[in-house]
Every structure is written in C-alpha cells, then in structure tokens.
Amino acid sequence: MENRSLVTIAEHSKEKILYLLEMAKEFEKKPNRKILDGKVVATLFFEPSTRTRLSFETAANRLGARVIGFTDPKVTSSSKGETLKDTIMMVSNYADIIVMRHFLEGAARYASEVAPVPIVNAGDGANQHPSQTMLDLYSIYKTQGTLENLNIYLVGDLKYGRTVHSLLMAMRHFNPTFHFIAPEELKMPEEYKIYCKEHHIKYKEYTDFNEETIADADILYMTRVQRERFTDLMEYERVKDVYILRNKMLEHTRPNLRILHPLPRVNEIAYDVDENPKAYYFQQAQNGLYARQAILCDVLGITLNDVIEDAKK
C-alpha cells in the first residue's frame, strides 16, 4: 500500500506543491464542508504547540472529521515508559491519520515507517516542519502572485529553526535567492548550505541586520531565538536580542515586501510593525487553516477534483 505520509517537504515535486496550493485556494473559498465526515484525526503533541495544533484541529473539524489526541505527554502512557512505536500502533487502532509533533529529530520518519495509517509531521525537533512550509508557500504565493525568482531573507535562528530548513527545501523548485541573516552562533547549518549548492540555490550570508541589508527583500521571514533548543542558557542570553525588526527599518523597502513569521513572536518584531501594511504574519497564520485542510485531504487520498466537486454540494 502506498505510504501517503507527509514527513518532509523535500519529497514533494514542484507539481505537487502547486497542486496543494490550488487545493488550499479551494478551501479558502469554502472552508466548511463534510468531505472528511466519518474520519478520525489523531493529534499527538509531545512538544508544546498553539497554532499548529489548533489549526490542524480546526481544519479537521471544519471538514467534518472528529479529533482525538493529547497536548501533554505527561498524561499519557509515554510517561510510564511506553515506546513511541507502541503509542503510534495503539493510536492507529482509533484514527485514520496521525498528526504528530515530537522533540526528537527523525521521530516523524520513524513513525511513518511503523504506522499502518498516514503520519503528518507537525514538527520534529530542529529538523522539519512541512505543514508550516505549505502555509508559508501559500502566503508567499498570495502576496507576490508567484513563487518564482524571489529574494527571500531568513532572519534570526537559522540553526534550530525547522521552519526555515523546510522552506529552503521547498523553494528549490522556484529559483529563489536566499539571504541568511544570523549571528555566528545561529548560522544556517552546513548541511543546508550543501543542499543549496547541490540544488543550485543562490544564497548570501550576513551578520548585520539593518535597513540597507533588507532593502531588496520580497519576503522577510523573521524567526524567534528558541530558548528550548539551547543547552547553554548563557549562549541563549547572548543572542536572544540580536535582531529586532522596527518599523523605521521598513521605510525604504520594496512596495511588495511582506513580513512573515511562523510565530510565536517574542521580541524580534517590534509591536509598531503590526500596523504596517507589509506585516503579514497574522494573515499567514490564518492561511494555515486552508493549507492544513489541503494536507489532510491529500494524505487521506482526496483529490483536488473531489474538493472542487464537493464545493458544488
């Protein structure tokens, strides 16, 4: 049987990405449906989440599915020593699809190999976050009218930021130029720079973050410095306030610039930026609903044509 799990965005072709964006567009037109009536979606969150969990659960509910799961592994048998495999096998008895976030890199891949139902990776450590990438791509497409030939600036925690790792891989199909802005301690890992070279992705690196640096940006993708990824809190304190985007820095940026952020924000975007029309991070979060509706349907074998026909009911 075909494994329809979504573990990494790197497994999606250009055609598949554009197909899912078309499906998300259909769900934005009509988000409330019964196309998943009778299905059960399990959300297993071994690591904290607000937006990802709520948007997946809302996506499932709005499509007629039922949701089961947990948000705190301490209240499950994993706190008694149950293995990830046993948890996955047990939940597979009750659900048609499992959406899982885990603190270990590679956990989603492992789950997809042992589970009899599809797995959607909702984030595995500092590794990948493919559903966030789909909503990021949808946000970029909506605001720029294209995914092709864009200047994309990634700012902040590029070492542990799984969202930027996934976005970089997805954009390989669209001839981007990436600009990595990070302190030395949080630079883009070497493996992703090698990936860029192997896939002929242009990139530049900076440590300065100012209005001159970002003047040519089409997309400015801000990230928070993730305290939970640091083993050395002194290192975290050194870098947590390094880059803060302020409204005055946007005065001479391109008119089409949009600011994205996977959220939650800590202090890397000043609150005065929220009122700037170039700020798009709250709309970006809303786009997560439509992107995740598309992901759930695709993984469960529902086609774009099914979605279009369903809208006529």
UniProtKB/Swiss-Prot annotation:
GO MF terms here are: amino acid binding; aspartate carbamoyltransferase activity
Keyword Ubl conjugation belongs to the record: no
Residue positions annotated to bind L-aspartate are 80, 162, 224
Tell me which SUPFAM superfamilies the record gives.
Aspartate/ornithine carbamoyltransferase
Pathway assigned to this chain's UniProt record: Pyrimidine metabolism; UMP biosynthesis via de novo pathway; (S)-dihydroorotate from bicarbonate: step 2/3
**Superkingdom, natural source:** Bacteria
Q: Which PROSITE patterns match?
A: CARBAMOYLTRANSFERASE
Enumerate the catalysed reactions: carbamoyl phosphate + L-aspartate = N-carbamoyl-L-aspartate + phosphate + H(+)
Is ATP-binding set as a keyword in this record?
Answer: no
Biological process annotations from GO: 'de novo' pyrimidine nucleobase biosynthetic process; 'de novo' UMP biosynthetic process; amino acid metabolic process
Swiss-Prot/TrEMBL keywords: Pyrimidine biosynthesis, Transferase
GO cellular component terms, A-Z: cytosol
Question: Per its UniProt record, what NCBIfam families does this chain match?
Answer: asp_carb_tr, PRK00856.1
Q: What does this protein do?
A: Catalyzes the condensation of carbamoyl phosphate and aspartate to form carbamoyl aspartate and inorganic phosphate, the committed step in the de novo pyrimidine nucleotide biosynthesis pathway.
Q: State the family it belongs to.
A: Belongs to the aspartate/ornithine carbamoyltransferase superfamily. ATCase family.
Quaternary structure, from the entry: Heterododecamer (2C3:3R2) of six catalytic PyrB chains organized as two trimers (C3), and six regulatory PyrI chains organized as three dimers (R2).
This protein's name? Aspartate carbamoyltransferase catalytic subunit
Q: Which gene encodes it?
A: pyrB
